[in-house]
Design a protein with these regions (language model features):
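Alpha-helical scaffolding within the catalytic cores
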Residues: 42-44, 66-76, 104-108, 170-174, ...
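Substrate-binding cleft of extracellular glycoside hydrolase catalytic domains
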Residues: 94-222, 226
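Substrate-binding cleft of secreted/luminal carbohydrate-active enzymes
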Residues: 56-61, 281-363
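Bacterial N-terminal signal peptides
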Residues: 12-23
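Aromatic-lined carbohydrate-recognition surfaces of secreted/lumenal glycan-active proteins
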Residues: 59-61, 188-190, 213, 217-243, ...
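Bacterial N-terminal signal peptides that target proteins for export
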Residues: 2-13
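Aromatic- and acid-rich polysaccharide-binding/catalytic face
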Residues: 87, 245-266, 308-309
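N-terminal module-boundary/linker segments of secreted carbohydrate-active enzymes
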Residues: 27-90, 95, 99-100, 351-363
Length: 364
């Protein structure tokens, strides 16, 4: 047996032992910010914490109406399925209408991907609460709220707050389907909030973008009881119109993971700032354009996953670059036993506890 395979199996065995109840391992696992988090959500967070510093899960984003198109392309390019499957509740390019009609099919694809062994992460390019869907992406998602509208949005009982609740409640219904199917989700709310290109972003301070993040956390956790969510806080790499990251942090009691989007240069200062702000929580590259090299991953070992943005896997990277990171020893693809064994353990534990069997399918 090759040395690489032996090393992979040894690490998989140690991670599985932890998932099955190793006391020492459990003591080092972070407590979810939601005290009522499901066993699956807790296990997923504990797994990500366990690989921090040792390995990184490969990931790929997909547009709502694309199913698993870009995940399948990553496989075609590298021969490996990404370990993390990313989807979106609302993203359309240019003047196309928002992809709200794709949500039911997207949820079914998420279930299939999880059953086949992938970690699931979901993003939401939410339209302004002043707008009714469907609308165009540029007009609404990249629109603007006045300061007065922003204050109304954060004030319970106002017409704009009520509209926002109605909008959020629709997406909560889809997330509830995943909760009831025992699918844990890395949920990335109001991403890139330190940037000025989305209506929710570019507002630093306690009453700014972070306050809206806390508001959706409260509604999803305390009203809808979406206890399958692992809460992912996210910023863009600082520079240009993206402000200092600490000005947007909602507080450690609202974030299970601390993540950054980097589309070009993986500066060491970005990594260091995330490690410091996370204060022991797992960190990740929630979006990348250009893939990190194996050398970058060795120098920045605490990233727990990366997610390439849809077509960028091909348009911003050469075939050699994609294969270099997907076949790096540190990288965990879907079939890697260091990922596949723990994910199977989580699904089997669900079946044992609830009688609900989450099994793989022929769909990729």
């Amino acid at each position: 047996m090759q040395v690489k395979t032996i090393r992979m199996l040894r690490l998989a065995a140690s991670v599985l032992a932890g998932l099955l109840g190793c006391a020492a391992w459990a003591q080092t696992a972070p407590e979810p910010v939601n005290p009522n988090a499901t066993p699956e959500a807790r296990a997923l967070l504990a797994y990500l914490n366990s690989i921090s510093g040792n390995a990184i899960v490969t990931g790929q984003h997909n547009y709502p109406n694309d199913g698993a198109r870009w995940t399948n392309l990553a496989h075609d390019l590298t021969g490996k399925y990404p370990g993390l499957f990313g989807q979106d509740f609302g993203f359309s390019a240019g003047d196309d209408k928002d992809s709200v009609l794709s949500r039911p099919a997207m949820i079914e694809e998420v279930k299939r991907q999880y059953a086949n062994g992938a970690i699931v992460t979901l993003t939401w390019h939410e339209v302004r609460p002043t707008d009714d869907e469907p609308v165009t992406f540029h007009e609404s998602v990249q629109g603007h709220l006045t300061d007065s509208e922003w204050q109304q949005l954060l004030t319970p009982g106002t017409p704009l707050y009520i509209r926002w609740c109605s909008q959020v409640d629709v997406v909560a219904g889809y997330l509830r389907q995943l909760r009831d199917a025992h699918v844990p989700v890395l949920f990335r709310a109001y991403h890139e909030m330190n940037g000025s290109w989305f209506w929710w972003g570019g507002r630093p301070g306690k009453d700014g973008s972070a306050a809206l993040y806390r508001q959706i956390y409260d509604r999803f956790v305390n009203v809808h009881h979406l206890d399958n969510l692992v809460w992912v806080w996210n910023v863009n790499a600082p520079g240009g119109s993206a402000g200092p990251i600490a000005d947007y942090y909602p507080g450690p009691q609202y974030a299970d993971l601390v993540t950054m989007d980097i589309y070009s240069e993986f500066k060491q200062q970005f990594y260091t700032s995330m490690v410091e702000l996370a204060a022991g929580k797992p960190i990740a590259l929630a979006e990348v354009g250009k893939l990190p090299t194996p050398e970058v991953l060795e120098q920045q070992p605490r990233w727990t996953y990366f997610m390439t943005w849809s077509e960028w896997i091909q348009t911003a990277n050469t075939l050699d670059q994609a294969n270099a990171v997907y076949h790096a020893l540190r990288s965990l693809n879907r079939d890697d036993p260091r990922l596949a064994v723990p994910m199977e353990a989580i699904r089997k534990a669900t079946a044992s506890r609830t009688g609900v069997r989450v099994s793989g399918s022929n769909s990729q």
